[in-house]
UniProtKB/Swiss-Prot annotation:
Keywords, sorted A to Z: Cilium biogenesis/degradation, Coiled coil, Cytoplasm, Cytoskeleton, Microtubule, Nucleus
Entry comment describing in which tissues the protein is expressed: Expressed in retina and brain (at protein level).
Places the protein is found: Cytoplasm, Cytoskeleton, Microtubule organizing center, Centrosome, Centriole; Nucleus
UniProt biased composition (Low complexity): 457-470
Gene name, Swiss-Prot/TrEMBL: CEP162
Coiled-coil segments on the chain, per record: 559-782, 813-1165, 1210-1242
One GO BP: cilium assembly
GO CC term, one of those recorded: nucleoplasm
Protein name: Centrosomal protein of 162 kDa
Length: 1251
C-alpha cells in the first residue's frame, strides 16, 4: 500500500508541474472541484483505515477521555496569550510539570469546586495568578457562549488524532478569533528555555519578556536549521540517519515505475498550490531566526530537527521545538485533521479563485519550486486518521487556501529564494530522508491528562524534559552520554546562550492518567523530517492513493529541477548585489557623518580658542591697568620724597586724613544705597499690604452681608416657627461669636495699619536726611574739583612745553637716522659694485690669459718674421745712409726730416699720457671732495650731538644745583619764617604732587590708548596679511582648476566633433542602404510585371510567391543575412555596409563609454583638487593661528618688559631711548669710518693697477 501511495504521489506531482506549464485551460472549474473532492474523500477514507489499524489505543483513549485540560504556547506571535480552558473543554496537551505538582493541582481544584457555589471562571483565575505569580501570562478570556461552542466541538473530535508528537486543540472558537486578528511579527518577543534547566529560569525569562504567548496565531511553516536541544534525538547517530535516508530514497525510486494519475492532475495542482500558499505565510519572519553552523555541510541539528506541525490560524499542537526555526511548510494532515469543524457553503467563490490561480503561472512555478524536494521525499508513516467527513474537510481545505491566498506571493518568493540558497545542504538531506521509511519505528509520547491541568505550575519543581520520553528498543542501546556529546557538539555558543535564556514555546499541562497515548504520539515527531517535505508528501500522497493512471519520465523532473536551480542562483546573485549596494550606501553615510562630526569638533575648538584668547587679552589689560596704577602711586611717592624732604609725621597725618575722608565717603555711599533699597522694599511691601487689606475688607464686607442675610432669615424663621426656640438660640449664639471674632480681626488689622504708617514716616525722615547728606557731598566734590582743575591746567602747560622740546629732539634724531640710512645704502651699493668689478676682473683675467697664449704664439711667429725683415731693412737703411752720407754728408733736408720726425713722435706720446693722467686725477679729486663733504656733515652732526650732550649735562647739573639751593633755602626758611611758611610750602608741595599725579595718570591713559590703537592696528594688519595669503592661495588654486577645466573642455569639444563626424558617416551609410533597398524593390516589381504577362493562368499562385519573395529578401537584409535569389542581382556591398554600420555603432558606444569614463575621471580630479584646497586652507589657517599666537606672545613680552623697565617717569624713559640711539649712532659711525678706510684702500689699489 505504501509503494502505491508513493507512486501516486510522484505521478501527481509531475502531472501537476506539466499541467502548470502546458495547460490551456481545458478543464473547467466544476470538473476540478469534482475531482478534488473525490481525491480528498478517498484520501481521508484511506487515512482513517490506516490510523484505526495503527493507533487503536489512541482512538480509544481519545474517545474515553471526556475531560481534558491544556495550557498551550505554540504561537510565536506577539499578540498571543495563554488559554486556560475549564474542566468541560477538550483541550489536551503535553505538560512539563511533575506528578507531584499535578496531584497538588488536582487537590486544589477539587477544593475549589467543592467550595464554589457557581461554576468556576478559569480565565479570571488566570488573571489573578498573573497579578500574583512571577510568570506573566495574559489570560485568554472566554465567554459562556464560547464554552458552549467548544463543548460542541469536543463531541466532534473525541477520537481526533494528532499529526506528529502533539495533541490537537480543536477549538472552533479559535477560528473566528484568529480570522479577525492579523498575523503580527513573530519571534519578536519569543523567549525560549532549556527543559533541562530549572523553572526559575523560566520565570526570569518570562519576567524579562513581559509578553504572554498563546495558541491564537500559530506559525504555519517550521523547518529550521536548529535541533531541539532540550529533547532527545531518538537515539540516532549520523550514520544511522544516513542509512535510513538511503533506504527511504531507494524505496521511493522503486515505487516511481508504474503510476496512473492523469485524472487528478489539475485538482491536485490547485489544492497543493493553495496549501503551499497557506503554509508560506510566515516564512520571512522565521527565516530571520535560523541558526546554522559555519560549514556548508549539514550538521546533526539539520538531520535530527524535530518536526513542528502547525496549522493555519491556531490549529497547532502542544509540542514545538524550543529553538527559533525557519518556517517552510506544514503537513496535509495538519490541514485535514486540525481544521475547525465549520460548514462552508461558498463553493463558487473557491471556483473563481481557483481559475485565477491557474492563470498566475509565475507564482505557481515559484510556489511549487519552494517545496519540490519535499514533494519527492515524503515518508509514508506520517499519515494520520480522523473521523471527520470528507466533504467537510475538502471544503475547509478550500476555505483555508482562499483565506491565505490574499497577499502571500511575496512571502512565497522570499521562501523560494531562501530555500534555494541552501541547495548544497539539501543534497545530503535527500540521502538521509531515504532511510526514514525503512527503519525508524513509530514512537508515542507521554501525555498527562487531568482535570486540572489548566493552571500554571508554581515553578518550584523541575519541568519534565523530552529526555524522559520513551525510546524504542533498537535505540535504547545508545547511552545518554553519547547523545549529550552529540548535542553539545552541534550547539554553537550563541545557541547555548539562547537556550539558557529562553523559554519553552510550548507549555501544556495534563494529568498522568493517559500516559500510554502520549508514548504512541512520540513516534510521529521524527526529528529528521522537515515540515516542508511533509506538506508536499502528504498532499500528493493523499491524491495519488486511488488515481495512478499516467506514468511520467524522471528526465523532465530533472530538467525542471535544473531550471529551478538556475532561477535560485539568479536570485542569489541579485540578493548579493543588493547587499553590496546597501553596504556601499551605509559606508558613504558613515563617512559623511564622520566628516560632519570632525567639522563640528574643529569649529568648537576654534571658538574655544578665540574665547580663551579674548579672556587672556582682557586679563592682560586689567593687569596692565593695575600695574600702571601701582606705578603711578609709587612714582608719586618717589617724586615727593625726591623733590622735597617733608617731615614724615605730617605726611602720615595727611595720608590718614585722606584715607578717613575716603572711608567716610564710601560709608555715606553704602548707606545711601542701603536706604534706597530699603525705601523701595518698603514701598513694595506697602503696596502689597494695601492690596491685602483691600481684599480682606472686601471679604469681611461680603461676610457681614452674608451674616446679615442669615440674621434676617433666622428672624423670619423665628417668627414663622416659634417651636424651635433652642435651635434658634444656638444659631444666634454662633453668629454672635463669629461677629466677635470678626471684630477682633478688624482691630488687629487696624493696629497693623497704624504700625506700618509709623514705619513709613520713619523711613521718609531717613530719606530726607540721606538727601541732605548727598547734597552736602555734592557741594564738597564741586569745590574740590574746581581747585584741582586750576592745578591740572598749570601742569598741562608745563608738560606741553616739555613735549615740544622732546619732539624737536626726536626730529633731529630722525634726520640723523635718515643720513645714516643713506650712508648705509651707499655702502651697500659700493660693496655690490666692488663685487661686480671683482667678478669682471676675474673674467677679464681669464679671457686675457687665453688671449695672451694665442697672441704669444702669433707674436713669436711674427717676431721671427719681423726680426728677419727688420734686419734686412736695417741693413738696407744703413747701406742707404752710407750712400747718402757719402754723396751728401751735410744736406739740410736730411737734418730737417730727422728733426721733424723726432718732435712728432715725442709730442703725441706726451699728449696722450698727460690727458689720461689729468682725467684720473680729476676723478680722484672729485671723489675725495665728495668724501670730505660727507665727513664734514658727519663731523658736524657729531659736534651737534656732543653739544647736545654737554647741554643736557649742564641742564641736569643746573637742575640739581637748583634743587640743592631750594633745599638749603627751605631748610633755612623755617627758622626764619616759622610754622606758617612750612604749612604754605607743604600745601604747595601737596598741590604739586596732585598735579604731577594727575599728569602722570593722564599720560598713562594716553599711553594705554596708544597701545590699544597699536594693538588694533597690528590685529588689522595680521588679518589683512591672512586675507592676502588666502586670496593668493585661492587665486592660485582657481587658476590651476581653471586650466584643468579648460583642458577638459577642449578634450570634450574634440570628442564631440569626432562623434558628430561618426554620426554623419552613419547617416550617409544608412541613406546608401535605403537607396540600395529601394533599387531592389523596383527591380523586383519589374520582374513581377513580366511574370504576370507571361503566366496569366496561374495568377493567384504567382502573386503569393512573388509577395513571399519580396518579403524574404527584405527580412534577410534587416537580419544581416544575404539570401540567394536568382531573379535578384547578387549585391555584395550590402553586407559590407551593414558590417560597417555595426562597427561604427560599436565605436560610438566605445566613445560614449570613454566620454563617461573621462567625465568620471574629471569629477574625481575635481574632488581631489577640492580636497587639496580644503587641506591647504586648513594648513594655512593653522599656520596663521600659530603666527597670531606667537605675535601675541611677543607683544605681551614687549609690554611686560616695557612695564618692568619703565619704573621711572616719562623723562627717564625718553633719556633711555636717547642713550640707546646715541650708542647706535656711535656704532654706525665706527662702521662708516671702517668702510671709508676700505674704500681708500680700494682706490689706492685701483690706481696702482691702472699705473
Amino acid at each position: 500500500m505504501l509503494e502505491k501511495f508513493h507512486k501516486n504521489k510522484k505521478d501527481s506531482y509531475l502531472n501537476k508541474e506539466e499541467g502548470s506549464l502546458t495547460s490551456d485551460g481545458s478543464d473547467s472549474p466544476k470538473e476540478i472541484l469534482e475531482t478534488s473532492e473525490r481525491i480528498v474523500k478517498k484520501a481521508l477514507q484511506l487515512t482513517e483505515e490506516t490510523d484505526e489499524n495503527v493507533h487503536p489505543e489512541k482512538m480509544q483513549l481519545q474517545k474515553s477521555n471526556g475531560v481534558a485540560f491544556s495550557l498551550s504556547r505554540d504561537s510565536l506571535e506577539t499578540n498571543d496569550s495563554f488559554v486556560a480552558s475549564g474542566p468541560n473543554q477538550s483541550n489536551t496537551g503535553l505538560g512539563l510539570d511533575t506528578l507531584e505538582e499535578q496531584e497538588e493541582k488536582e487537590i486544589f481544584f477539587a477544593k475549589l469546586e467543592q467550595e464554589a457555589s457557581s461554576p468556576i471562571d478559569y480565565s479570571r483565575l488566570n488573571k489573578e495568578l498573573n497579578l500574583s505569580d512571577s510568570i506573566v501570562l495574559a489570560p485568554f478570556v472566554r465567554n459562556e457562549s464560547e464554552k458552549e461552542v467548544e463543548s460542541t466541538a469536543e463531541e466532534k473530535c473525541e477520537s481526533y488524532s494528532e499529526d506528529f508528537e502533539e495533541d490537537t486543540d480543536a477549538n472552533p472558537a479559535f477560528k473566528t478569533e484568529e480570522s479577525q486578528e492579523p498575523n503580527s511579527g513573530m519571534l519578536a518577543k519569543v523567549v525560549l528555555l532549556d527543559s533541562q534547566d530549572s523553572t526559575t529560569e523560566f520565570q526570569k525569562a518570562a519576567e524579562t519578556s513581559g509578553v504572554a504567548l498563546s495558541e491564537h496565531d500559530l506559525p504555519q511553516e517550521v523547518g529550521g536549521t536548529e535541533m531541539n536541544e532540550a529533547g532527545t534525538l531518538c537515539g540516532q547517530t549520523t550514520s544511522d540517519t544516513e542509512a535510513l535516508h538511503h533506504a527511504y530514497h531507494h524505496h521511493i525510486d522503486q515505487s516511481l515505475g508504474d503510476t496512473d494519475e492523469q485524472k487528478i492532475h489539475s485538482s491536485s495542482m490547485a489544492i497543493s498550490q493553495c496549501l503551499v500558499q497557506v503554509t508560506s505565510q510566515n516564512h520571512n519572519l522565521y527565516s530571520k531566526n535560523t541558526s546554522t553552523t559555519e560549514s556548508d555541510l549539514p550538521t546533526v541539528e539539520e538531520f535530527m530537527r524535530p518536526i513542528k506541525g502547525d496549522c493555519y490560524n491556531a490549529r497547532g499542537f502542544d509540542l514545538e521545538p524550543e529553538s527559533p526555526v525557519k518556517v517552510i511548510g506544514s503537513t496535509v494532515n495538519e490541514h485535514v485533521n486540525h481544521l475547525p469543524y465549520k460548514e462552508h457553503k461558498n463553493e463558487s467563490v473557491w471556483e473563481t479563485n481557483l481559475l485565477e490561480k491557474f492563470n498566475r503561472e509565475d507564482s505557481i512555478f515559484l510556489q511549487t519550486a519552494a517545496n519540490e524536494d519535499s514533494f519527492l521525499r515524503m515518508p509514508g508513516k506520517e499519515i494520520q486518521t480522523s473521523e471527520v467527513q470528507p466533504d467537510v474537510l475538502s471544503k475547509e481545505i478550500i476555505q483555508d487556501c482562499l483565506l491565505s491566498q490574499g497577499s502571500k506571493t511575496k512571502q512565497v518568493l522570499q521562501s523560494c529564494c531562501l530555500k534555494n540558497e541552501k541547495s548544497e545542504s539539501t543534497t545530503t538531506k535527500q540521502m538521509l530522508y531515504k532511510n526514514i521509511r525503512s527503519t525508524t519505528p513509530l514512537h508515542k509520547k507521554k501525555s498527562s491528562y487531568g482535570p486540572h491541568g489548566v493552571v500554571r505550575s508554581s515553578g518550584y519543581g523541575k519541568s519534565t524534559s523530552y529526555s524522559k520520553q520513551s525510546i524504542p528498543a533498537t535505540e535504547r542501546k545508545i547511552p545518554k552520554e553519547t547523545l549529550k556529546k552529540s548535542i553539545m557538539k552541534c550547539r554553537s555558543p550563541a545557541d547555548k546562550a539562547r537556550s539558557k535564556e529562553a523559554l519553552f514555546t510550548t507549555r501544556t499541562i495534563r494529568s498522568a492518567a493517559n500516559q500510554q497515548a502520549s508514548k504512541e504520539d512520540i513516534s510521529r515527531a521524527m526529528p529528521d523530517q522537515s515540515v516542508v517535505q511533509n506538506l508536499g508528501h502528504q498532499v500528493v500522497d493523499s491524491f495519488r492513493q486511488h488515481h495512478s493512471d499516467l506514468p511520467v519520465s524522471p528526465v523532465k523532473s530533472c530538467e525542471r529541477e535544473l531550471r529551478l536551480l538556475r532561477r535560485a542562483q539568479v536570485a542569489e546573485e541579485d540578493l548579493s548585489r543588493a547587499r553590496d549596494v546597501i553596504q556601499q550606501l551605509t559606508s558613504t553615510v558613515s563617512e559623511k557623518e564622520k566628516e560632519m562630526e570632525t567639522k563640528i569638533v574643529e569649529l568648537k575648538t576654534r571658538y574655544e580658542k578665540e574665547l580663551s584668547q579674548l579672556g587672556q587679552e582682557n586679563y592682560v589689560l586689567q593687569s596692565k591697568l593695575r600695574s600702571v596704577e601701582e606705578l603711578s602711586k609709587e612714582k608719586r611717592w618717589i617724586h615727593q620724597t625726591g623733590t622735597v624732604s617733608v617731615p614724615e609725621e605730617k605726611l602720615a597725618q595727611i595720608q590718614k586724613e585722606m584715607e578717613d575722608q575716603e572711608v567716610i565717603i564710601q560709608g555715606y555711599q553704602q548707606e545711601n544705597e542701603r536706604l534706597y533699597k530699603q525705601m523701595k522694599d518698603l514701598q513694595i511691601q506697602n503696596k502689597k499690604n494695601e492690596e491685602q487689606m483691600y481684599k480682606e475688607n472686601q471679604c469681611l464686607m461680603s461676610e457681614l452681608i452674608a451674616l446679615r442675610e442669615k440674621v434676617e432669615r433666622i428672624n423670619i424663621q423665628s417668627q414663622i416657627v416659634r417651636e424651635s426656640e433652642p435651635a434658634r438660640n444656638q444659631s444666634f449664639t454662633e453668629l454672635i461669636s463669629e461677629l466677635r471674632a470678626a471684630r477682633k480681626e478688624e482691630t488687629k488689622l487696624r493696629e497693623e495699619i497704624r504700625r506700618l504708617k509709623q514705619d513709613k514716616q520713619a523711613l521718609e525722615l531717613d530719606l530726607g536726611q540721606a538727601k541732605k547728606e548727598r547734597d552736602l557731598a555734592k557741594v564738597q566734590i564741586t569745590s574740590t574739583s574746581s581747585e584741582k582743575s586750576y592745578e591740572f591746567k598749570i601742569m598741562e602747560e608745563t608738560y606741553k612745553q616739555e613735549i615740544l622740546h622732546l619732539k624737536r629732539r626726536l626730529h633731529w634724531y630722525a634726520e640723523n637716522q635718515d643720513l645714516l640710512d643713506k650712508d648705509a645704502a651707499r655702502l651697500k651699493e659700493a660693496r655690490e659694485e666692488i663685487e661686480k668689478l671683482k667678478q669682471e676682473v676675474k673674467k677679464l683675467r681669464a679671457e686675457a690669459g687665453d688671449h695672451q697664449c694665442v697672441q704669444q704664439k702669433k707674436r713669436l711667429r711674427d717676431r721671427a718674421a719681423d726680426a728677419k725683415r727688420i734686419q734686412d731693412l736695417e741693413r738696407q737703411i744703413k747701406e742707404m745712409e752710407g750712400i747718402l752720407k757719402r754723396r751728401y754728408p751735410n744736406s739740410l733736408p736730411a737734418l730737417i726730416y730727422a728733426a721733424a720726425a723726432a718732435e712728432k713722435t715725442n709730442d703725441l706720446s706726451a699728449k696722450t699720457n698727460t690727458t689720461d693722467f689729468l682725467e684720473r686725477r680729476i676723478k680722484k679729486l672729485e671723489t675725495e671732495l665728495e668724501g670730505k663733504d660727507d665727513e664734514a656733515k658727519t663731523s658736524l652732526r657729531a659736534m651737534e650731538q656732543q653739544f647736545q650732550k654737554i647741554k643736557m649735562q649742564y641742564e641736569q647739573r643746573l637742575a640739581e644745583l637748583e634743587q640743592l639751593l631750594a633745599y638749603k633755602w627751605k631748610s633755612e626758611s623755617p627758622k626764619l619764617n616759622g610754622d606758617k611758611a612750612n604749612c604754605i610750602e607743604l600745601e604747595l608741595q601737596l598741590q604739586n604732587l596732585k598735579k604731577t599725579h594727575q599728569i602722570t595718570v593722564e599720560n598713562l591713559q594716553t599711553e594705554i590708548e596708544n597701545l590699544k590703537s597699536q594693538n588694533s592696528q597690528l590685529k588689522l594688519r595680521s588679518k589683512k596679511d591672512n586675507k592676502d595669503l588666502q586670496l593668493a592661495d585661492w587665486q592660485m588654486k582657481q587658476g590651476n582648476t581653471k586650466e584643468k577645466l579648460l583642458k577638459l573642455n577642449q578634450e570634450l569639444i574634440t570628442k564631440n566633433r569626432e562623434i558628430q563626424d561618426l554620426t554623419k558617416t552613419v547617416e550617409k551609410l544608412q541613406k546608401e542602404r535605403m537607396a540600395m533597398l529601394s533599387d531592389n524593390n523596383l527591380r523586383n516589381k519589374t520582374d513581377n510585371k513580366e511574370n504576370r504577362q507571361e503566366s496569366l493562368k496561374n495568377n493567384t499562385v504567382a502573386t503569393e510567391k512573388r509577395n513571399s519573395c519580396n518579403s524574404e529578401p527584405l527580412i534577410g537584409i534587416f537580419n544581416n543575412d544575404k539570401i540567394y535569389q536568382p531573379h535578384n542581382f547578387s549585391d555584395s556591398n550590402v553586407l559590407e555596409v551593414l558590417q560597417e554600420n555595426a562597427r561604427l555603432k560599436e565605436e560610438v558606444e566605445k566613445l560614449s563609454l570613454e566620454m563617461n569614463q573621462q567625465r568620471v575621471k574629471s569629477q574625481a580630479t575635481l574632488a581631489y583638487s577640492e580636497n587639496n584646497i580644503r587641506r591647504i586652507q586648513e594648513d594655512t589657517a593653522e599656520y596663521v593661528a600659530a603666527l597670531k599666537a606667537s605675535h601675541q606672545r611677543e607683544v605681551e613680552k614687549i609690554l611686560s618688559q616695557y612695564t618692568k623697565d619703565d619704573s621711572a617717569s616719562k623723562v627717564a624713559e625718553l633719556n633711555g631711548r636717547i642713550s640707546t640711539q646715541e650708542i647706535l649712532i656711535k656704532h654706525l659711525q665706527e662702521q662708516i669710518s671702517e668702510h671709508q678706510r676700505h674704500q681708500e684702500a680700494l682706490l689706492v689699489s685701483q690706481m696702482r693697477e691702472e699705473f
